[in-house]
């Protein structure tokens, strides 16, 4: 059975969310086109992904040198790390969903990638650089932004989107080929509110098409 892992890295508010609405259109289309596939949704804002902080590094050290001294809190923390990693490894396709925050992804998504990007699991180091271990898998990055950052008529703004480049480069590092790393940008709705309906329809149509082919 093919497994699709959707990673939601978006806060839940009463306001309309362009990225969350777009991924819902994608999911609906995907389910219709892949009825036998398993879909897992990780909501990072609700789950509070563990950070790589002092507690984490201390738990790692105790686990390596003195595992008998691990506390219940240590064991729970390490278990959560392992759970995120194993789930990511077991999936065949990934969808990352986030708004652009100050030219980057949300802190929750960055923390999640820090947790799952484990050497010798997702990639290995060689004298010629890292080699990815997730060959054959696919990713789709859905990102919303109020302005335009990926306008073919004005590509200069792409340099301001560090988040999309980060996700793409990370997936490349772990072994996903160029054709298996895809992006869907939902943009311009704040800059041109009078075009909101047009931009929404464009985003939803793209999401539907991605859902059919992904």
Curated annotation (Swiss-Prot):
<keyword id="KW-0520">NAD</keyword>
<keyword id="KW-0560">Oxidoreductase</keyword>
<comment type="function">
    <text>Quinone reductase that provides resistance to thiol-specific stress caused by electrophilic quinones.</text>
</comment>
<protein>
    <recommendedName>
        <fullName>FMN-dependent NADH:quinone oxidoreductase 1</fullName>
        <ecNumber>1.6.5.-</ecNumber>
        <ecNumber>1.7.1.17</ecNumber>
    </recommendedName>
</protein>
<dbReference type="GO" id="GO:0009055">
    <property type="term" value="F:electron transfer activity"/>
</dbReference>
<comment type="function">
    <text>Also exhibits azoreductase activity. Catalyzes the reductive cleavage of the azo bond in aromatic azo compounds to the corresponding amines.</text>
</comment>
<dbReference type="GO" id="GO:0016652">
    <property type="term" value="F:oxidoreductase activity, acting on NAD(P)H as acceptor"/>
</dbReference>
<feature type="binding site">
    <location>
        <begin position="144"/>
        <end position="147"/>
    </location>
    <ligand>
        <name>FMN</name>
    </ligand>
</feature>
<dbReference type="InterPro" id="IPR003680">
    <property type="entry name" value="Flavodoxin_fold"/>
</dbReference>
<dbReference type="GO" id="GO:0010181">
    <property type="term" value="F:FMN binding"/>
</dbReference>
<keyword id="KW-0288">FMN</keyword>
<dbReference type="Pfam" id="PF02525">
    <property type="entry name" value="Flavodoxin_2"/>
</dbReference>
<dbReference type="InterPro" id="IPR029039">
    <property type="entry name" value="Flavoprotein-like_sf"/>
</dbReference>
<dbReference type="InterPro" id="IPR023048">
    <property type="entry name" value="NADH:quinone_OxRdtase_FMN_depd"/>
</dbReference>
<comment type="similarity">
    <text>Belongs to the azoreductase type 1 family.</text>
</comment>
<dbReference type="GO" id="GO:0016655">
    <property type="term" value="F:oxidoreductase activity, acting on NAD(P)H, quinone or similar compound as acceptor"/>
</dbReference>
<feature type="binding site">
    <location>
        <begin position="17"/>
        <end position="19"/>
    </location>
    <ligand>
        <name>FMN</name>
    </ligand>
</feature>
<dbReference type="InterPro" id="IPR050104">
    <property type="entry name" value="FMN-dep_NADH:Q_OxRdtase_AzoR1"/>
</dbReference>
<comment type="subunit">
    <text>Homodimer.</text>
</comment>
<keyword id="KW-0285">Flavoprotein</keyword>
């Amino acid at each position: 059975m093919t497994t699709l892992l959707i990673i939601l890295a978006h806060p839940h508010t009463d306001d309309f969310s362009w990225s969350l609405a777009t991924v819902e259109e994608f999911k609906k289309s995907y389910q219709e086109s892949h009825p036998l596939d398993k879909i897992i949704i990780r909501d990072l804002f609700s789950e509070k992904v563990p950070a790589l902080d002092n507690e984490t590094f201390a738990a790692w050290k105790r686990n390596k040198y003195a595992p008998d001294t691990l506390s219940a809190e240590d064991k729970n923390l390490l278990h959560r790390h392992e759970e995120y990693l194993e789930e990511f490894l077991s999936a065949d396709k990934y969808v990352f969903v986030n708004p652009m925050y100050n030219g980057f992804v949300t802190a929750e998504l960055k923390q999640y990638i820090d947790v799952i990007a484990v050497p010798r699991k997702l990639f290995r180091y060689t004298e010629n650089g890292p080699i990815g271990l997730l060959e054959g898998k696919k990713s789709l990055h859905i990102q919303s932004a109020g302005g335009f950052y990926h306008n073919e008529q004005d590509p200069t703004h792409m340099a301001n989107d560090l988040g999309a480049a980060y996700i793409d480069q990370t997936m490349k590092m772990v072994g996903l080929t160029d054709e298996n790393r895809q992006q869907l940008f939902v943009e311009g709705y704040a800059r041109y509110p009078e075009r909101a309906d047009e931009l929404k329809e464009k985003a939803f149509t793209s999401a539907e098409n991605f859902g059919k082919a992904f």
